[in-house]
Amino acid sequence: MRVAPPYVRAAGRFEAQLSVLTGAGNMGNYNMHAVAKVIHGGKAYEVPVLTGNALKHWHSVYLAEVYQDLGGTQLNEFCKKGVGLRGKNMSGEDASSEAEAIKDLCNDLHGFLLPDKQIKRDSLVRVSFAVPVLEEKNLEAASKFAVVHNRVDPFKRTQQVKSKEEQEGTEMMVFKQEYSSAVYGFAAAMDLGLSGVPLYQEGESGVDDRERALRIKSALVALLRLFNGVGSKQARALPIARLRELVIAISDSPIPNLVHGAYPDYVARSAELLTAYLKAVGKKGVVLCYGVDCPQSNNVLECKKADTLDDLFQEALRRALPGGQPARR
C-alpha cells in the first residue's frame, strides 16, 4: 500500500456508567449486554465490552455530522443517516468502481465491499474493542447487571376481562435490560492521507486537496464526540461517561499502532515502540497527551502534554492537516 501522510494513532481511557455499550440480543424479555473474556495475571475475566464494530459505527455517524457541520457535501443518503450500507455511489446505487464509491465520505474513510462486482476498499479507520482496564481492582469491579423496566399498555384488557362491555383495564409489560459500569481502554488507527485515493483500482476520485483536508479534519474531530456518545439504547440509557485520558500520535511515516489503553503502562510502552520504529526508519513523529503524563522527548519523537482537550486537538489538527488549520468548505 502506498505511503501517504498523515498517519494518526490514538489510545486512551474513558469511564462509562449505567450504559449499554453494545447490545447482544435478547432471550424473551431479557436484553443482554455484550461480554468477552480477557486474561490478566493468569486469570480469565468475563467483562462487558464495546465491540470494535460498534465503536467504528459511532465514529462514522459522528464523522458525517462533523463533516456536514464544517460545510462538507460529498456524502450519500446512507452516510447522512448513519446507515452502514457501504459501496453505494452518490445516487445510492452500487458503485461501478472504487474511484466512484469514494466520492462519498463514508465509503472513503470506512471502506466497503461489493462482492458481486469484486470491488473493495480497506477501511482507513480501524478501531479496537474497548475493554475494562487490565488492573485487578477494575476487572473485579467491572460489572453488568439487569434493571427491570415496565411498560404499560392502557388499551390492552387484562386476562380476566372477557368482553368489551366489561370494565377495561391495563396490562403491565415487564422487561429486563443489562447495563454495565467500568473504566475502559481503547485504541484506534487512521491512515488519513489515503483519503480520496483509490487503493486497488486505477482512476481519479475527483476528491481535491481542499476536500481531502476537510475529511481529515472531520475524522479527527469526530473522536471528540465518540467517547461521550457511544452505545445502544441511548434513548433511555445515554451513557454517564467521561474521557479520562487520550494519547494521539501523528507522523508522516506509517507508524505502529499504539499500545491499547487497557494496559496500565500503555503510554510508556507506546512511546518506546514509536521511538524504536522511527529510529529504525529514520523518520520523526509527535505524541500528544491529555490527562496523563507524557514521556520525555527524544531526537525522533516529540512528546507534548496538553492541559485541555482544546489544546490537544488544536495541536493535532495543526500537525495533521496539510498547511495547518483551517479546513472548511
From Swiss-Prot:
Keyword annotations of the record: Antiviral defense
Domain of life: Archaea
Transmembrane segments: none
GO biological process: defense response to virus
Induction: Repressed by 5 J/m2 ultraviolet light and 50 mM NaCl, slightly induced by 20 J/m2 ultraviolet light, 100 and 150 mM Nacl. Member of the csa5-cas7-cas5a-cas3-cas3'-cas8a2 operon.
Key word Membrane present: no
Family: Belongs to the CRISPR-associated protein Cas7/Cst2/DevR family. Subtype I-a/Apern subfamily.
Subunit comment: Can form a Cascade complex with Csa5, Cas5a, Cas3, Cas3' and Cas8a2.
UniProt function note: CRISPR (clustered regularly interspaced short palindromic repeat) is an adaptive immune system that provides protection against mobile genetic elements (viruses, transposable elements and conjugative plasmids). CRISPR clusters contain spacers, sequences complementary to antecedent mobile elements, and target invading nucleic acids. CRISPR clusters are transcribed and processed into CRISPR RNA (crRNA).
Official protein name in the record: CRISPR-associated protein Cas7/Cst2/DevR
Species: Thermoproteus tenax (strain ATCC 35583 / DSM 2078 / JCM 9277 / NBRC 100435 / Kra 1)
Phylogenetic classification of the source organism: Archaea, Thermoproteota, Thermoprotei, Thermoproteales, Thermoproteaceae
Gene: cas7
